[in-house]
């Protein structure tokens, strides 16, 4: 079966033919590739084509596809049972592994997705502060729970849908939206609203393309939250263990009240978490009145994969330097080639995360990101795919470097960039 036939068949039985909207390739006026398998830095579609994969399952695969250590850990766990709905030692082991490197985090709760993590963190913040409103930032995506699907990035930006049908106005009215990297917009909202339970932010935004928050902006944001008895939530579902081993904390050293984790923490399996100090976490059920639960939360396969992934990342002391060097080479190379062709391009990286926009102006917020030339992006994506490079099929997503990549892979990619720029 070909990719084209597979998508046509999928559309008969799966809504939209995919189980997450951006996978449909609609934003690049194309059809998705159906993947048969992956190995290291590469994926292979059912037509027999191979691609250097810069999506890496949208971030979780720090060590690329089919990493032997993670596979071995999963196989060992699977032989004992896939899920019990009861505590296992693996949950405590992964909890200790995560908390040991964050002095301000004392307890953690595992869930199965980033959406669950942020949704639960919001509920926890409201329960702890006894306040109703939440403040988020335009273009930041925190999963698809109702209160957070307001002025969202990621898929919502891809489909020009800042919110969603089905999100009740009575729910959305409790969500305040500020401008990313603009502290004055935050101050204005705090002046008008005295019942803000929490501020949630991607400290390294990866869902409007890659847009890191400025250090002084985050520092001032933390002060405002503290002065108003408002909890600060860092959504590190994407940036955790990606931007650095300690995510944004390893870069900006700001201690958020709650951190959400995901992607890498599950080593490629469905897992996420939220963590905070004990006085906050202890109001979760069964100790307190904030309810959160999940049938597969902390399941042994995901915990085993997470332990293997984080243990390996922690042991490889030069891993993040290598990934950052490769990401820098890629983004600087893209910028140089664009300049040579007279194409407007902004490109940047943070650790193993990278992004690019077809615009002449620097990008520091969602409105800047929206200025990117989407027609150019679409043409570029199509040409890169034809040249064997698999990039995220949306301008408003982030790319990822994995440990199986090297200078040769980047050189091949930059040659594909050169050829693609010639055609667009």
From Swiss-Prot:
GO terms for biological process: protoporphyrinogen IX biosynthetic process. One of its GO terms (molecular function) is transaminase activity. One of its GO terms (cellular component) is cytoplasm. The gene is hemL. SUPFAM superfamilies: PLP-dependent transferases. The modification N6-(pyridoxal phosphate)lysine is found at residue 263. It is found in: Cytoplasm. It is an enzyme of class 5 (isomerase). Its main location: cytoplasm. Its EC number is 5.4.3.8. This is Glutamate-1-semialdehyde 2,1-aminomutase. It catalyses: (S)-4-amino-5-oxopentanoate = 5-aminolevulinate. CDD domains: OAT_like. Belongs to the class-III pyridoxal-phosphate-dependent aminotransferase family. HemL subfamily. It holds the Pfam family Aminotran_3. It comes from Campylobacter jejuni subsp. doylei (strain ATCC BAA-1458 / RM4099 / 269.97). Pathway: Porphyrin-containing compound metabolism; protoporphyrin-IX biosynthesis; 5-aminolevulinate from L-glutamyl-tRNA(Glu): step 2/2. It comes from the Bacteria. HAMAP family: HemL_aminotrans_3. Signal peptide: none annotated. Keywords: Cytoplasm, Isomerase, Porphyrin biosynthesis, Pyridoxal phosphate. InterPro entries: 4pyrrol_synth_GluAld_NH2Trfase, Aminotrans_3, Aminotrans_3_PPA_site, PyrdxlP-dep_Trfase, PyrdxlP-dep_Trfase_major, PyrdxlP-dep_Trfase_small. Its cofactor is pyridoxal 5'-phosphate.
């Amino acid at each position: 079966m070909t990719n084209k036939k597979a998508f046509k068949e999928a559309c008969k039985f799966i809504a939209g033919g995919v189980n997450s909207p951006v996978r449909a390739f609609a934003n690049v006026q194309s059809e998705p590739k159906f993947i048969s398998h992956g190995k290291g830095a590469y994926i292979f579609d059912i037509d027999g084509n191979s691609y250097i994969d810069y999506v890496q399952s949208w971030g979780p695969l720090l060590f690329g596809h089919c990493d032997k250590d993670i596979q071995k850990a999963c196989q060992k766990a699977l032989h004992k049972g896939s899920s019990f709905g009861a505590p296992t030692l693996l949950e405590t082991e992964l909890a200790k592994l995560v908390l040991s490197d964050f002095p301000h985090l004392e307890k953690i709760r595992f869930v199965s997705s980033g959406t669950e993590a942020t949704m639960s963190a919001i509920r926890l913040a409201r329960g702890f502060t006894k306040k109703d409103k939440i403040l988020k930032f335009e273009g930041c995506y925190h999963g698809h729970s109702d209160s957070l699907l307001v002025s969202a990035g990621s898929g919502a930006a891809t489909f020009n849908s800042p919110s969603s049908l089905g999100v009740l106005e009575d729910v959305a009215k409790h969500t305040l939206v500020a401008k990313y990297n603009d502290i004055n917009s935050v101050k204005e909202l705090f002046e008008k609203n005295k019942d803000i339970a929490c501020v949630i932010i991607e400290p390294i935004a990866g869902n409007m393309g890659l847009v890191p928050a400025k250090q002084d902006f985050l520092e001032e944001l933390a002060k405002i939250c503290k002065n108003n008895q408002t909890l600060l939530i860092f959504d590190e579902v994407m940036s955790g263990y990606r931007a650095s081993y300690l995510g944004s904390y390893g870069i900006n050293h700001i201690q958020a009240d709650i951190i959400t984790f995901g992607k890498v923490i599950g080593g490629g399996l469905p897992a996420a978490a939220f963590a905070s100090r004990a006085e906050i976490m202890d109001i979760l059920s069964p100790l307190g009145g904030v309810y959160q639960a999940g049938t597969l939360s902390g399941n042994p396969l995901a915990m085993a994969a997470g332990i293997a992934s984080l243990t390996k990342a922690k042991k490889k002391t030069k891993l993040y330097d290598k990934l950052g060097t490769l990401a820098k080479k890629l983004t600087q190379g893209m910028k140089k080639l664009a300049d040579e062709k007279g194409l407007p391009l902004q490109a940047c990286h943070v650790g193993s995360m990278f992004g690019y926009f077809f615009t002449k102006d620097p990008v520091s917020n969602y409105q800047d990101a929206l200025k990117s030339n989407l027609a150019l992006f679409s043409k570029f994506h199509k040409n890169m795919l034809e040249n064997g490079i698999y990039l995220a099929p949306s301008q408003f997503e982030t790319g990822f470097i994995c440990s199986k990549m090297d200078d040769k892979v980047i050189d091949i990619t930059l040659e594909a960039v050169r050829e693609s720029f010639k055609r667009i």
